[in-house]
Amino acid sequence: MPVKHWSRAGLMLTAWCNARCASCYLCCGPDRADEMPVATALRVWEELIAASPHGCRIHLTGGEPFGSWERLIELCLAARAGGLGPLESVETNAFWASSPALVGERLRALDQAGMGKLVISADPYHQQFVPIERPRLLARVGEDVLGAHRVQVRWRDWLETGGDTDCLAPPEREALFARYAAAGRERVSGRAAFSLSASLPQRSPSQLADTSCSEPLLRAKHVHVAPDGSVMPGTCGGLVLGRCDHESVAVMWQRLGQDWADRPVVGALARGGPAALLATATAAGFVPEKTYAGKCHLCWHVRRFLHRHGAGEGELGPDWLYQA
């Protein structure tokens, strides 16, 4: 099966985030210190564009990329000065948006540095840590500075009708999270596998046995690059396709196309989905739960076991993601 070129990539500038959201499939939080140096980000950005005949659209993400404003704007300005492809978007939870003046100043700077869209996170999980007035302020000023077509909110309905969730009693907040997760918007892996899975419809591992993962792993054309250079499928945090700190993106992509089927983790998932990886883990002593909230939940549980038992070397990481 040919591996499609990556035409969209998110550079994780940091694993740090002011929030520790129940929905975070990358397990980011205030205790994460991993950062991608500007020089590394520029090199990877350039290599991603060069490795694909169609180019590669870049978005900057985290963690929370606004955790270091100076580094964020330095990267954007350097990328523009270096003639790299357009910056598709920058993502943020708006924790920093404390005044119209500050928001306007930073958005004008990003606009001049070539940012396409501003992507704002707003949902019950983020509002446990970020007052909802901050994403509302950011969206409002963003539409004035950039135009409404360049401001994207995930999710707009919550931004308009939601509220702060840190003030809710834990049972009330958990019930709200459960109702929101039931809409199917979240990836049930990482922290979400522990925080949200119990409230979702459950299926036995045998009911998840007919789902190959070849499309999201090899054909989806979207990846994330972690601060340490680990390249992960766009929606599969903790599954490593290669390391662009060890070799160029082009060489890494070629290597994946040549040997993906021989890789113990990626190969098993591409052929038979989490059920195939479950067989490997069971032989090593893994005991599955009776039910899971979908194949991503099962996959995460299996991968976490394998990582903790020293299996999947080079394919499971970064390490901090599995230590949550």
Which residue ranges define each predicted feature?
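Flexible mid-to-C-terminal extensions adjoining Fe-S/redox cofactors in radical SAM and related proteins
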Residues: 238-324
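Radical SAM enzyme [4Fe-4S]-AdoMet core and its adjacent flexible, acidic
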Residues: 108-247, 251-255
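Short catalytic/ligand-binding loop motif for oxyanion handling, primarily in non-cytosolic enzymes
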Residues: 30-32, 67-68, 97-99, 126-130, ...
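Acidic, amphipathic alpha-helical patches
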Residues: 103-107
